[in-house]
């Protein structure tokens, strides 16, 4: 069972949650003064239109015609499936649906914001975009966006994933991007971390620092971010807006589930539904799933912190483990982040979104069952959502009640097979750190 929309149903507007949040978003702070940052300082890092979108209180932002055309080219609208075989395997009365972002040409949701960010950069006359990537999904997406729109792309990839997922590098290079392991010897902050540990596995926080340092050396370059900030999450709402249309062919969901690193794929599916809860039109539940190795939602502190490891970004008020936190080298590279989207942090604080955390071994067990029943090998990041779905479906079975579960399968795992090999060979290591810098 699946629902497929025609190209004409690609959303014409992104949904901006800012005007609907239960409390105002705390302003980002200038790291030099600890005062709210002036937008002019952000313009040296980000494309101008993205800074405007970040600050906008308009509920809807029109999607440019060119971006909608590119969305159609890369596989939007993506299909929505019912996981009937998984339901049978679990023996649950719950009905499970998933939005499959792995159907895009780059294999994940990341292309939704990559195309938007590249479009606005090109319109401004920017020549080069620089970014970070964890597992490589975001770097791959921005590399293709650059190729389609005529921009040079440079990617700093967390070293652990650079080594674990070699074919991501090949794809990025094929799309024309430069790619470097992070920490690298190309930046001052990279050299600092390498001097402390020549085999440092890196992480999203360090890669962000390197990308920003790189950008500040070139007037024609700007930084592109794969998650966390509001404009990134807003671009992803095409997922949830499509899913709302597709679920009309089936039934209303009771609970919506997604994995979380910075928060963009979760927000992409959930925020259009959150809007209906905040306006009193619906009563959905929302579950956000993270790794126990990077538990910003379940064990972090809500405070101002840097978005990167080097302290180059503005300070944001968010759930954080501390920007100097060493994130263990789990295979879900896209979830190896110390912080969290500020908008999602607020929703968690108000009890609208409920977080849970799992070890990577149990996550891969869930992924194996999903692969055997539904045929799709999920990305390790997306497999966290699947683990959450399975637990929720088994709870419905235990309580003898029907329930409709909708989750975001944010990407496929066909280039993450080293993690699956380690799992099948019994080599996976579970991490549950007991020290986080933000907690002191």
Curated annotation (Swiss-Prot):
Q: In which pathway does it act?
A: Amino-acid biosynthesis; L-tryptophan biosynthesis; L-tryptophan from chorismate: step 5/5
What is the required cofactor set for this protein?
pyridoxal 5'-phosphate
Record carries keyword Lyase: yes
Q: Which cysteines are joined by disulfide bonds?
A: none
Q: Which UniProt keywords apply?
A: Amino-acid biosynthesis, Aromatic amino acid biosynthesis, Lyase, Pyridoxal phosphate, Tryptophan biosynthesis
- EC numbers listed for it are 4.2.1.20
Q: What does the record give as the reaction this protein catalyses? A: (1S,2R)-1-C-(indol-3-yl)glycerol 3-phosphate + L-serine = D-glyceraldehyde 3-phosphate + L-tryptophan + H2O
HAMAP family, alphabetized: Trp_synth_beta
The name on file for this protein is Tryptophan synthase beta chain
């Amino acid at each position: 069972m699946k629902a497929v929309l025609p190209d004409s149903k690609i959303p014409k507007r992104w949904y901006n949650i800012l005007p609907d949040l239960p409390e105002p978003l705390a302003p980002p702070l200038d790291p030099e003064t600890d005062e709210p940052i002036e937008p002019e300082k952000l313009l040296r890092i980000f494309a101008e239109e993205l800074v405007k979108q970040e600050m906008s209180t308009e509920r809807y932002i029109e999607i440019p015609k060119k971006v909608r055309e590119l969305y159609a080219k890369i596989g939007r609208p993506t299909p929505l499936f019912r996981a009937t075989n998984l339901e049978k395997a679990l023996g649950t009365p719950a009905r499970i649906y998933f939005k499959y972002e792995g159907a895009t040409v780059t294999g994940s949701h990341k292309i939704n914001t990559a195309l938007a960010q590249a479009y606005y950069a090109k319109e401004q006359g920017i020549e080069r975009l620089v970014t970070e990537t964890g597992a490589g999904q975001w770097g791959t997406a921005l590399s293709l966006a650059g190729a389609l729109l005529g921009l040079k792309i440079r990617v700093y990839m967390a070293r652990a994933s650079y080594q674990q997922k070699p074919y991501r590098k090949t794809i990025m290079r094929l799309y024309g991007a430069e790619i470097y392991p992070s920490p690298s010897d190309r930046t001052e902050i990279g050299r600092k971390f390498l001097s402390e540990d020549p085999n440092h596995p890196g992480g999203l926080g360090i890669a962000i620092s390197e990308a920003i340092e790189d950008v500040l050396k070139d007037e024609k370059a700007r930084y592109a971010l794969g998650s966390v900030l509001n404009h990134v999450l807003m671009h992803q709402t095409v997922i949830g807006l499509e899913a709302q249309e597709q679920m009309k062919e089936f039934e209303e969901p009771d609970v919506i589930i997604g994995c979380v690193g910075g928060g963009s794929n979760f927000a992409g599916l959930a925020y259009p539904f959150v809007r209906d809860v905040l306006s009193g039109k619906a009563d959905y539940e929302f579950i956000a799933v993270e790794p126990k190795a990077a538990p910003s939602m379940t064990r972090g502190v809500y405070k101002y912190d840097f978005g990167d490891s080097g302290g180059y970004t503005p300070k944001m008020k968010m759930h954080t483990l501390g920007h100097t936190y060493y994130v263990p080298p789990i295979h879900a590279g896209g979830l190896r982040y110390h912080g969290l989207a500020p908008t999602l942090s607020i929703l968690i604080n108000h009890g609208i979104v409920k977080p849970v955390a799992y070890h990577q071994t149990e996550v891969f067990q869930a992924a194996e069952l999903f692969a055997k029943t539904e045929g799709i090998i999920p990305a390790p990041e997306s497999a966290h959502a699947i683990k959450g779905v399975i637990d929720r479906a088994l709870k419905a079975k235990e309580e003898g009640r029907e329930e409709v579960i909708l989750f975001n399968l944010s990407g496929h795992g066909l280039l993450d097979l080293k993690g699956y090999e380690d799992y099948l060979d019994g080599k996976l290591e579970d991490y549950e750190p007991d020290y986080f810098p933000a907690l002191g």
